[in-house]
Amino acid sequence: VYTMQLNLSGIGKGFCADEGTKILQDAGQKYGYYNLGASSMVLLSDPSHRDTGWSVSVTSPRYFSDSMSYATLRAHDIVLSTSGDYEQYYELEGTRYCHIVDPNTGYPIGAAPSQSGSYVVCATVIGGNAAAGDARATALCCMTLDEALSYSRAHSSEFKVLFVWYEALTNEYIAYSNLENWTLEE
């Protein structure tokens, strides 16, 4: 007997990050950072790097090199939210089935026959509040490349993004960002 359970708790960690930030700031906390399972992170000021902020590495969805990260950014007084197919998944007959279900297809992202295996494998949203960032990062993973680019550009004044698109036809990974202060790891 197989059992399956769906929940909509994808923004739960972001909501907790937002509420935790309020509590810490109300208590006078000005410095530091904290994360909730690495997918929701709050960066307050860094007293040792006041101008540049914290150095944050974004985990690589496929470990492109010896490094486990694919990008590094410097930031402070901001939230980051990440979604992707690389931590909660299984593979069956060469297809990856992850925990993010595309509401348009009913399949996990990248697994729908109509997608030809091309999809956003991970997305990080920087700015806004963490709950909205969690929702946006997950939504980006369910978009086509054109949709993700259009959405990111249309909302660039509200938040920044960093995402990786997997193109199955050419077996390439393409990183995109509208951030100014990030570096791609070689």
Spans of features found by a protein language model:
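Mature catalytic core of soluble alpha/beta enzymes
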Residues: V1-E186
